[in-house]
């Protein structure tokens, strides 16, 4: 069953990803302060692929509506360098 909410389509794009839970929480708080809607999901990293992620077991992915992407990138660009350096930004 598909629910239709007006012209809503599930076409969110990835804003950023990180393996650090604290960085993902700080990024989510920064987006909330600016009233930017987003979705934060976690993905479990398989045991044998953890070496590529420096031993992390969870990958946090923040997705956003494409129309709000520019505004969200400005929020991330204004974050502290300590947090920003731990994010992998997409090139949407």
Model-derived segments and spans:
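Acidic/polar low-complexity segments and flexible, solvent-exposed patches
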Residues: 1-92
């Amino acid at each position: 069953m598909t629910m239709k909410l007006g012209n809503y389509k599930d076409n969110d794009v990835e804003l950023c990803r990180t393996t650090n839970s604290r960085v993902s929480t700080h990024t989510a708080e920064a987006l909330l302060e600016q009233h930017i809607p987003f979705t934060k999901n976690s993905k479990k990293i398989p045991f044998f692929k953890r070496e590529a992620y420096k031993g992390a077991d969870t990958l946090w992915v923040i997705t956003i509506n494409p129309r709000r992407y520019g505004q969200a990138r400005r929020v991330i660009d204004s974050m502290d360098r300590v947090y920003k350096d731990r994010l992998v930004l997409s090139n949407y």
